[in-house]
């Protein structure tokens, strides 16, 4: 075998993950090259500061939401088939639920402003404002320059889960979505039903535009029902079997007119693999509701920030 062929073979073979060594006092992903300075402990003892404290963000009117939920009626539903994606629309002031119906199943959620697809969910800022996992009361913020809430979580039957002893939580905004490019990078295999691919096809069908044209619109997701976190030793992204069971749901208020796209992840409950046909997969149900209480709902305005009229 030539060196070139051997090199390609080594590059394309899946890498084996070695169990980490027991962590030291200061956990590290790589063996350090440089010695710690004499004041290392003092430097590491600096106080933690929350980067974006959200307390000044006006909260939703909890009484209004309670009244809306009490009077809501289902007006539509969309079934998302296993290893596929579907789109749905919700008017501002409406509510929608993502429901587990047949078995544990993770869903990858994209949200867009229905009238301007360039305004879409921004997982990074949502994570910075609300943390790594979302639940009741947390909002899903849109991209710059709009930076407004697209949706707010109004109910979550998995809110009891919290964070487990592995550091795992449910409904994360840290994972990007499974995609065929990363799958090929790691395994040299082509798989066409990753959530990225499913979402791209669904948005293409909805808009009537070519898949290659809409692909850049597909963005980092909210991983609905997915149980994830960062390992305690190396801080690597991990997943474990979702605690979701049939009948569980997460519910949202649409703060603007929304286009949603949801993929039923090929990983099923994501307790093992996520980019193959190996896992048992189940459909997800999207239920759309309206409430007369919300008929006068005013969508959240875009950011009031304005660039200066002259150079600064």
Q: What is each residue range found by the language model?
A:
Residues 25-312:
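Acidic, Ser/Thr/Pro
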